[in-house]
Amino acid sequence: MTLFAGLARTRSGLLARLFGSRDQKVTPQWLGALEEALLRADVAVTLVDPVMAQARDLVLLEGIDTVPKVLDAVRGALVRVLGAEDLALRTSTVRPRVILLVGVNGSGKTTTAAKLAKRLKDAGESPLLVAADTFRAAAIEQLQAWAARLDVPVVAGKPDGDPAAIVFDGIAAGIARGSTTVIADTAGRLHTKAHLMDELGKVVRVAGRARAGAPDEVLLVLDGTAGQNAIEQARGFTAAAGVTGLVITKLDGTAKGGAVFRVASELHLPVKLLGVGETAADLVPMDPLAFVDALLPRS
């Protein structure tokens, strides 16, 4: 699924309120509809306020009063929120690159691990998956099934096993096999449970023993519908595991894709990947301009 298609639900809510003819004039009612549309899409009030102030200044101070020109300014403001630095996955001078996926239950970590493996394999890499979610036997089986489907090797632990030991073994296997990237799926855990976050911290430390400098990325997988709770999750996981970037999932199932701007601005963490569908190919890299254009296309 393309980014444009994946954001259809959010876009439909915005378009219904904003677009008319190319020479449509901006009115107070239209500005009110723009503000409402952004808020309904879950763009944070702290972002909507300055965006709306800029839009009103264009109309009142600069005399720009056509809808397309004002929307161009809004697009530019939203692109700047997402930034352009550090959006690509980090590389490593030492193989294998190690990527840990962390997050709460139900955020889509296991599926994201498989999608990322496919993406890297399609790019010519040799990924290896690590099923380190020992809390749920189903998660191990799910990742093994994905690995078989994608023809990607997988190292799996046993239910109730030590996840840090499994990650260590997975990295060691990646070194032995000459894998380019090891992707470890960790157990879902509440950011409010200190002992579970301590366990995650141990996983990070042990990864560094298996390969100096690992992990290269700690990606927090966030459900795109989580709203303000995503902010609290990110703070907890960053404190425990040193999160380096975000993956926002389930954007195809929500009309609130504006939450991406909220997490990017409030967390000061790069959004690196977006989940826009259920198939293995539906994981796309963040492209700020393409993302904003998918929400507010140039009619």
For each of these PLM feature ranges, what is it?
Residues 4-132, 138-184:
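Primarily NTPase-proximal linker/entry elements flanking Walker-type ATP/GTP-binding cores
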